[in-house]
Amino acid sequence: MGSPGMVLGLLVQIWALQEASSLSVQQGPNLLQVRQGSQATLVCQVDQATAWERLRVKWTKDGAILCQPYITNGSLSLGVCGPQGRLSWQAPSHLTLQLDPVSLNHSGAYVCWAAVEIPELEEAEGNITRLFVDPDDPTQNRNRIASFPGFLFVLLGVGSMGVAAIVWGAWFWGRRSCQQRDSGNSPGNAFYSNVLYRPRGAPKKSEDCSGEGKDQRGQSIYSTSFPQPAPRQPHLASRPCPSPRPCPSPRPGHPVSMVRVSPRPSPTQQPRPKGFPKVGEE
């Protein structure tokens, strides 16, 4: 048998070989927060001291397997991993999971796992990457808040223009109404004019009061009104004047000529023609 020192040295060499051929997995980032509809990238780094021919990898979310492809001679056997997930391998040791676009269902804890099957079976698991998906975009919210004063300014401008238009319309309507009243178009501002018509020629002296009444009845009255005609008074026929008083004169204010009429002669006394002397006179 060998000495105890030789046995101890052999054990140390075997342990060193085992450590040199061990498999390690590092995962990042530990925490990732993105907005809904954007892109999320998770990285898994697989390290092994010795060369390997076949590597099996696996991604899980909250303990559920998303995908489990193989890597042989630097190529992936599967490029899809879960909903909206794509895998890519970059030699010698980088495995990337890309989620595009992310939704609220992508929030959770992601773990990368790797195993070497040839030449010997070895397994390793990475740390946890926690993914949080925000339903709203803080940047868009800030943009909405920043644009809100501008929107208020636009509303204020439109409201001012509307008020100005209403005031101008009221002023124009009032001015037009005043002009119509000043021009006499208002029903309360009517002008009336009475014209008394008298036929040419003076009446004969032999005509009695009844004849004058006929002349008065023959007189015409013209009335002009703007815009409404003046109400016409009922025409009153002149009554014959008793002898020997003359007929009453028309109302003052009307240019009517007055004719003096002598009393009506008796039946025995006939009117004498003008220009002949009386009996006994020469």
Swiss-Prot record:
PTM sites of type Phosphoserine: 220
One Gene Ontology CC term in the entry: plasma membrane
GO biological process entries: positive regulation of activated T cell proliferation; positive regulation of angiogenesis; positive regulation of cytokine production; T cell costimulation
Outcome of swapping residue 222 to F: Partial loss of phosphorylation; when tested individually or. Complete loss of phosphorylation
Residues covered by region (Disordered): 201-282
GO terms assigned for molecular function: coreceptor activity
Topology within the bilayer: Single-pass type I membrane protein
Spans through the membrane: 151-171
Sequence ranges on the Cytoplasmic membrane side: 172-282
Main localization category: membrane
Ranges of compositional bias, category Pro residues: 241-253
Keywords: Cell membrane, Disulfide bond, Glycoprotein, Immunoglobulin domain, Membrane, Phosphoprotein, Signal, Transmembrane, Transmembrane helix
Ranges annotated as biased composition (Basic and acidic residues): 204-217
PTM characteristics: N-glycosylated.
Glycosylation sites noted in the Swiss-Prot or TrEMBL record: 73, 105, 127
Family annotation (InterPro entries): Ig-like_dom (IPR007110), Ig-like_dom_sf (IPR036179), Ig-like_fold (IPR013783), Ig_sub (IPR003599), Ig_V-set (IPR013106)
Positions of disulphide bridges: 44-112
Signal peptide boundaries: 1-22
Residues recorded with modification Phosphotyrosine: 192, 222
Membrane side Extracellular: residue ranges: 23-150
Tissue specificity of this protein: Widely expressed, mainly by epithelial and endothelial cells, including bronchial epithelial cells of lung, breast glandular and lobular epithelia cells, urothelium of the bladder, skin epidermis, epithelium of gastrointestinal, rectum, endometrial glands of the uterus, ureter, fallopian tube epithelium, colonic epithelium, small bowl epithelium, stomach epithelium, including both chief and parietal cells, trophoblastic epithelium of placenta, and pancreatic acinar cells (at protein level). Consistently expressed in veins and arteries (at protein level).
Function text: Plays a role in cell-cell interaction, cell migration, and angiogenesis. Through interaction with HHLA2, costimulates T-cells in the context of TCR-mediated activation. Enhances T-cell proliferation and cytokine production via an AKT-dependent signaling cascade.
Quaternary assembly: May form homophilic interactions that could regulate cell-cell interaction. Interacts with CACNB2, DST, MIA and NCKIPSD. Interacts with HHLA2.
Identification of the protein by name: Transmembrane and immunoglobulin domain-containing protein 2
Gene source species: Homo sapiens
